[in-house]
Amino acid sequence: MGYLSTDKKKITTKTFAEMKQAGEKVTMLTAYDFTTAGIIDSAGIDSILIGDSASNVVAGNANTLPISVDEMIYHARSVTRAVNHALVVCDMPFGSYQISREEALRNACRMMKETGVDALKLEGGIEIIDTVKSLIDAGIPVHGHLGLTPQSVNKFGGYGIRAKEEAEAEKLISDAIALDKAGCFAIVLEKVPAKLAAEVTRQVKAVTIGIGAGAGCDGQVLVYADALGMTQGFKPKFLRHFAHVGEEMTKGVQSYVDAVKTGGYPSAEESY
């Protein structure tokens, strides 16, 4: 039958389920702006995540906590204007769904209406199940996120590997099953042992998307700036640089500066 994602039709949550059933890996990268999203989409990615990691990557914050609903909407609008093929998922930021189900639903509906994204992603397990169900009942596709959940960095005391101990591993499996039964179409598994992630993948119908969770997940996600070698001083074990865009950008800027300083740009052909 060939790969399901190569015909350039719009990827949907239904496509995700079909890909899992067919054994086709799902690819996901983050994007936060129109230009980058257009490049990533045209390259054939299955899904684009407007991550609250924009707080770090775009705004330079130390963690994801400061970013607001308004800021996420701004980034999401920029991305959806560029995307024709990929399934677009947007993170609900910290504080937008933890206070009450009613406030979560209000924020979720606003984000869906004002951005045009295909789904929303929430961090957490059984403790947010009622909220997840409320969103799904309202017709909003929900993408779960377990393991290292960056919005809980202060509770965890850092960004270390999660679920290494039996009790936490068992809870993660229970959380994944609960999210699956609630109707989540996909679940990110972040920085958990590969064997555990593979076991979760076997036990749930939802597509599992790994980041630092081994090859046994149904798909993988990375922050695009990390994957393309644009960030400095960040090289966790799970990260591979698939390009060296940062180096090329530096060379390009240096070439531009040199051309302007020496009078080589603009040339007569580049002038009106």
Task: For each feature predicted by the language model, list its residue ranges.
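Alpha/beta enzyme core
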Residues: 2-272
